[in-house]
Amino acid sequence: MTETNFSTKNSNHTPMIKQYLSLKSQYPNMLLFYQMGDFYELFYEDAKRVSRLLKITLTKKGNSNNNIIPMAGVPCHTAEYYLSKLVKMGESIAVCDQIKDVYSEKKLLTRQVVRVITPGTITDEAFLEENKDNFIAAVWKENNKFAYAILDISLGFFGVSEHFDRNSLLSEIERTNPTELLYPENFEDMLLISHKKCIQKRPLLDFDIKISYKLLTLQFKTSNLNGFGIKKNHFVIRPAGCLINYIKLMHISFLPHIRKIQFNYIENNIFMNSSTRKSLEIIESISGESKNTLSSVLNKTVTSMGGRLLNRWLNTPSKDLSLIKNRHGMVKLLRPFYKEIQCILRQVSDLERICSRLALRTALPRDFVRMRSTLNILPDLCLILKKIKSTSINNVLMSIGKFEKILFLLKKSINLTVPSSIRDGGVIACNYNKKLDELRSLKKNSQKYLQDFEVKEKSRLNIDSFKIGYNNIVGYYIQVNKRHSHLIPHSYLKIQTLKNVERYSVPLLKNYEKQVISAKFQAIFLEKTLYMELFDIIEPFLEDLKNSAFALSELDVLVNLSERSISLNYVCPKMTKKYGITLVESRHPVVECFLENPFISNSVDLSKKNRMLIITGPNMGGKSTYMRQVALIIIMACIGSFVPAKYASIGLIDKIFTRIGSADDVSNGYSTFMMEMTEISNILHNATCNSLILIDELGRGTSNKDGLALAWSCSKYLMTKNKSMILLSTHFIELTKLENFFKNIKNFYFSAFEHDSNIAFLYKIKKGISKKSYGIAVASLSGIPDIVIQDAKKKLIELESDNVF
């Protein structure tokens, strides 16, 4: 047998291995956690893979079919920790449990897969990241257009979008960053998705439009999808149906909290491709970290729901002027109250994900406790919001709600502190159910009964060593020292002899044991029943609870932006339909937070008179920072945030493009020059007059003449055809002559000065052209040997006098 062959026909396999292989054949592309007593074991290739990923010992389990069986395992009680690590690595796991009693007379225990865990279908908080959405996605191509569907089971969000080109789809994949991505077996554009960690090929039948339509209407309990803005034959139905079908295959048979599907119109938001997102370091830095990003500065939300929502906003800045102005208005109104509100919001749990687990009936006892705590503080929050006289704030207030009935139920039914699961009881509070109280009382009073029995018999028999004990093997027993065994009456039945003691039982004790154990199991069974009834009682309120969760997350974001505006000295931008961008004494929102010295502010004026600013100056002089801060301020303003400037007026922006070399990725076989040309080509084809374009040193990576010619021609095309708003930095001084040909091109520069072989950067933008590049001075700061620097200075003098070699 090879390690990838799951056939059970070979009679040389042991019964256990046959059972394992049979189960494994049903989940060939997943790791199979196979329970054996107190451990989950993995065999063959699964064992090797898990051993490598988790750095656990790889051992072996004898031979089967004349082959050594590789084996690795983890204890059952720590399995969740290892499962979480594997899921975060992009692995999918089938968990197979023993379902027969351990003491069954059958030699081979019955086992079955009880849950399937994939990166995109998890809802357990142990596997989820607090401030990140957890999307599973599916893609479909038809007539050179793409349909894309996303679903976050942990939140209950389901959306679809339509894309007319590869760049648009790639941008959406990067924005949503799915943890699992499904694609049809005949998908041709694998380069678009092959970089994702967990991609799953699915049969074409999963994307069948008729089957998908039926699945979706059944899911939403509707006769059609017209109410969601989706026509019967629209091709977005295909990937959406594939997601529903796949999730059902993953042992999630019903999704009661998925009640609608949202058609996401990407044209409602500012378009940013993956290159722009990387170079602007909005959510992740170029190195893939979360620190030193726009999100790391702006996202000081106090709830995980708010953290996720703000990151969504940062990834999809709006073009809707009324929406943006409404957010600015609420941020302004909330400024005097942010401390009070944040103090209360810190007590709010992740109600979004709790609601989803309640709908799926996978909520743990702590979810009920956290929901109770959250609902308990809502009245205090509402009292503060009522002080603010605003229609927008009042709408948030109405959505938050009160939920007195649910709160009363949870206070009455759930203990103040609860165990991690309902398995052993201890969750339902006293005085909630009379029968449960009686059963618990019987169990509780058993200790008093046993103590009385022990005192009575000890006195009657005059045996000092007489005592009553309990273990899981023999149950309740009477124990005496061997030296007192002659005093034991004949009615006592000896059940165990140990080194120094003997153990006995009596019918009275056994009968009482049965009553106590029966009461214990009856209590646990009843408690589980009452626990499940809570799901039924809460279910009708779930939609309102989800709306409340969203309102709380939105409030958290807006209050957070209020706090940021005060703490970081931001101003409310003026949003207008007019063309252009005016920023007075603007600052880079990220860089200013990490400088020891005050950030040097700069202004910018992009208008029909100043469409392109050509910026010269030394490396490290501030050119890239200046360009990035303009784009970041636009993004901040368009999500509803105040901005780092003394004054800001921002017109309509439809797209933001960047060509900044620090984001180059040559791992796919592209040279830096090819990357640059590809991105510039994309800009030339897709930018409009309302687009903001940042280009840092166009024309690198080839000869000076080739580079200058390309930079000149591209700049000319952008001015005459695209007519966009452009910030272009360059070391080609010749490029500044474009100002002589176009009245709406202006030259600016960042200056520096040298003194005693040292260079000082002024970081202040001025009108005009930089006289020097200061390249050698900057190079000396990098630690290049002084002898090389001095030689370079001599060569520069020769070059400038045309006496080259």
UniProtKB/Swiss-Prot annotation:
Cross-referenced Gene3D superfamilies: 1.10.1420.10, DNA repair protein MutS, domain I (3.40.1170.10), MutS, connector domain (3.30.420.110), P-loop containing nucleotide triphosphate hydrolases (3.40.50.300)
Keywords carried by this UniProt record: ATP-binding, DNA damage, DNA repair, DNA-binding, Nucleotide-binding
GO CC annotations on file: cytosol
Binding site for ATP: 617-624
Molecular function terms from GO: ATP binding; ATP-dependent DNA damage sensor activity; damaged DNA binding; mismatched DNA binding
UniProt keyword Signal, yes or no: no
GO BP annotations, alphabetical order: mismatch repair
Keyword Nucleotide-binding part of the UniProt annotation: yes
InterPro entries, sorted: DNA_mismatch_repair_MutS (IPR005748), DNA_mismatch_repair_MutS-lik_N (IPR007695), DNA_mismatch_repair_MutS/MSH (IPR017261), DNA_mismatch_repair_MutS_C (IPR000432), DNA_mismatch_repair_MutS_clamp (IPR007861), DNA_mismatch_repair_MutS_core (IPR007696), DNA_mismatch_repair_MutS_N (IPR016151), DNA_mismatch_repair_MutS_sf (IPR036187)
Pfam families: MutS_I, MutS_II, MutS_III, MutS_IV, MutS_V
HAMAP family for the chain: MutS
PANTHER family for the chain: DNA MISMATCH REPAIR PROTEIN MSH1, MITOCHONDRIAL, DNA MISMATCH REPAIR PROTEIN MUTS FAMILY MEMBER
Family per similarity comment: Belongs to the DNA mismatch repair MutS family.
Function: This protein is involved in the repair of mismatches in DNA. It is possible that it carries out the mismatch recognition step. This protein has a weak ATPase activity.
Name of protein: DNA mismatch repair protein MutS
Native organism taxonomy: Bacteria, Pseudomonadati, Pseudomonadota, Gammaproteobacteria, Enterobacterales
Gene of this entry: mutS
